[in-house]
C-alpha cells in the first residue's frame, strides 16, 4: 500500500551533454528483438534510449531502480559518466539505484525484495539498501556473503 503512494520506476532487465553517448545507452522493451534483426517497419522500435529518456519530464520520480547488469556504466565524458543513468538524471529523477558491473540474477531478485520491503516499512533509501545488503549476506546460510553479490548496487543523489 505504501509503495503505491511513492513515485518509483523499477527496471529489472536492461541492456549528458554528448547526445551521441546518450544514444548508445537505453532500455530494450517489447519489439526490440524485431528492430535488432531489422524486421520491423514501424516507428516504435522497442528501444528507449537515454536521449529519449532525457527529453521526458520525470521530475516527479523520487527513485528509479535500474537493477540489471552495468546500469551505472557508460561513456566517460567531460561532465561525468554518460549512460542510461544520465538520461534519467537529465529528465529530473531525484535519485537512482544503479549497478556497477555484472550482477547475479537470483541474488539481485532477493536483494531487491529486501530493498522494496524495507522501503515499504518506512526506511529511507540508504537504510533500505544497507539493510537489504546485510540481509542478503546472511541469507540462506550466507550463500550470498561474497561482495560480488551485493556490493555493486549503489544509490546516486539519494540525499534525505
Model region roles, listed by residue range:
Residues 1-160:
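Catalytic cores of enzymes
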Amino acid at each position: 500500500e505504501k509503495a503505491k503512494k511513492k513515485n518509483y520506476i523499477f527496471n529489472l532487465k536492461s541492456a549528458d551533454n554528448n547526445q551521441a553517448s546518450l544514444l548508445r545507452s537505453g532500455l530494450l522493451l517489447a519489439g526490440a528483438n524485431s528492430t535488432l534483426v531489422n524486421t520491423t517497419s514501424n516507428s516504435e522500435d522497442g528501444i528507449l534510449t537515454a536521449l529519449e529518456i532525457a527529453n521526458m519530464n520525470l521530475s516527479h520520480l523520487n527513485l528509479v531502480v535500474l537493477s540489471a547488469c552495468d546500469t551505472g556504466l557508460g561513456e566517460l565524458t567531460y561532465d561525468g559518466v554518460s549512460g542510461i543513468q544520465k538520461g534519467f538524471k537529465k529528465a529530473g529523477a531525484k535519485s537512482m539505484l544503479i549497478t556497477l558491473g555484472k550482477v547475479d540474477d537470483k541474488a539481485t531478485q532477493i536483494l531487491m525484495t529486501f530493498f522494496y520491503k524495507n522501503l515499504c516499512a518506512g526506511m529511507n533509501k540508504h537504510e533500505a539498501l544497507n539493510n537489504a545488503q546485510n540481509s542478503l549476506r546472511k541469507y540462506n546460510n550466507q550463500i550470498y556473503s561474497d561482495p560480488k553479490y551485493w556490493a555493486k548496487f549503489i544509490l546516486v543523489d539519494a540525499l534525505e
